[in-house]
Amino acid sequence: ESPVTFASQQQSISAENCHSNIRIATINLFNFIEPPLAFYDFENIYSHGQWQKKCQWFGELLNQYHPDIVGFQEVFSPEPLKQLATQQGLTHFAIVDSATLVSDYIYQSPVVALASRFPILEVHAIEPDAHLVAAMGLSSQFTFSRKVLRATVDIPQIGACDCYVVHFKSKRPGLALEPHPLGLTLSAPPTLALHSETKLLTEQALGRWASTMQRGAEAALLFHAILARRQSIRYPVILMGDFNDSLSMGALDALTLQGEHLHSNDIKAAGLGHLSDIARLAVFAQYRLQDAYELFIAANMPDNLVHSREHRAATHYYGPKGSVLDYILLSNEFDASDSRSLAQVVDYQTCDRHLVRPEYERDAYSTDHAPVWVELSLRR
């Protein structure tokens, strides 16, 4: 059987199947909940057969791609996931939160998890810095819409590596206007009663922007947490998950902020103006996170960058429109162009066959996202 049956196209230059290579994957499980529990609504319960098909699909995916470290999103039932991962040799498991019981057997707010073939040294839930939350003008109640997991994994020949799993705020607007404005006094001017269509459009416009602001704040505050950790403990970084937006969109800018993006006046004001260009770039490089796909095409297809970017496979479809929402970001230890790197990206797969060529019998209970898989080769 072809080694890429879960991918609709071979996007990569396949590396030698070297056992010392490290394979990383991020998988949105799409309502991974064991019956008789329900997700969001009492009608959303898998039958035993449907649940078996769902577990089988993910088991086959893990068996085929053989990842060493996997970040999962949309976990309602961690125990069955832990068992499924263990069956595939991913015997170390981390989770920092649990789904919320709404009533009886109905759950909402699924969480993220990580499974690893290698020992997990430490597990931590990232919390936003309260001082920065205040400085950004956010509510003191601000928190990540889903807790961010950091697991420090002991990777052979690399050592301790900080692996972050995220599921940023979705684009779905979660805003409902009150039928009557709150705090209205008798002396206040009368408010125009909105028609159904204008009320809906208003809720959508405000709700989408509120979601974007939440997602952007999550990205910036997480970037700060990663920076602070890198400054104190210089472990390599792998950040993976469902970002619910394109990296090229402004909301997620913070995650890939680089030294060359900074204004010279800001650099001088920070007391770094005395550094040469080369020294300054070296200082900032250690805090840089890069899209694994960009690292892959730069190292393996340098003459074909524009074509590779234009033909990147989507990881999610809204109707006919595809978007890349699922990412694996890597620190400079995995950048082939950095002389200090420990490994480089030699393969990149978007496992999208079930989205672009679905077969009901096989794919009906899979996922609405394409898992993303990368292979890292250790530098000799």
What are these regions (language model features)?
Residues S2-S12, A125, V133, G137-F144, ...:
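Metal-dependent phosphoester-hydrolase catalytic domains
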Residues E34-Q52, G174-T212:
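A solvent-exposed, charged loop/short amphipathic helix patch at secondary-structure junctions
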Residues G71, V75-A176:
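Structured beta-strand-rich core segments of catalytic domains in phosphoester-bond hydrolases
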Residues L90-L101, L184-P190, H261-S264:
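Acidic, His- and aromatic-enriched active-site or binding-groove loops in soluble protein domains
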Residues F30, V75-F76, K169, F243-S246:
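Catalytic metal-binding/acid-base residues of hydrolase active sites
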Residues E16-I24, S145-L200:
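Beta-strand-turn-beta hairpins that frame and shape the catalytic cleft
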Residues E1-V112, H195-K199, A219-A220, R234, ...:
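N-terminal, active-site-proximal structural segment of metallo-dependent hydrolase catalytic domains
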Residues N44-H48, P67-F72, A205-M213, L239, ...:
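Second-shell loop/turn segments in exported
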